Structures are given as structure tokens and as C-alpha cells.
């Protein structure tokens, strides 16, 4: 089993964990349907960048 030699400080622990944060999801509004959606994703109505991609 691995056992640490010395106690890690709160500062070093925080620096190590600084890359663990989840990125904030980017949100956009479609030009045509005015629907809120994630960036680079199709809307629930089937629009992507103002063009109807999927017929429901």
C-alpha cells in the first residue's frame, strides 16, 4: 500500500484539484425558432443554425 511521506498542504491539494472542475456548458439561441439549446447541438424542434434538419 502506498503511504505518503509528508502531509500535503491545502494549497498543494487545491493546486492538484484545480483541473478537476467541470466546464460550463455553452448555451445558444436558435435564429429561427428562438429556442435555447447547447452549442453545436440540434434543437428539440430539429433546427441547427437556422436550418430545419429533422422533420418530426
UniProtKB/Swiss-Prot annotation:
Organism: Blochmanniella floridana
Cellular component aspect of the GO annotation: large ribosomal subunit
Family: Belongs to the bacterial ribosomal protein bL32 family.
Keyword Ribosomal protein attributed: yes
One Gene Ontology term from the biological process aspect of the record: translation
UniProt name for this protein: Large ribosomal subunit protein bL32
UniProt KW keywords: Ribonucleoprotein, Ribosomal protein
One annotated GO molecular function: structural constituent of ribosome
Keyword Nucleotide-binding: no
Biased composition range(s): Basic residues: 9-19
Pfam name, any one: Ribosomal_L32p
Region (Disordered): 1-23
InterPro entries in alphabetical order: Ribosomal_bL32, Ribosomal_bL32_bact, Ribosomal_zn-bd
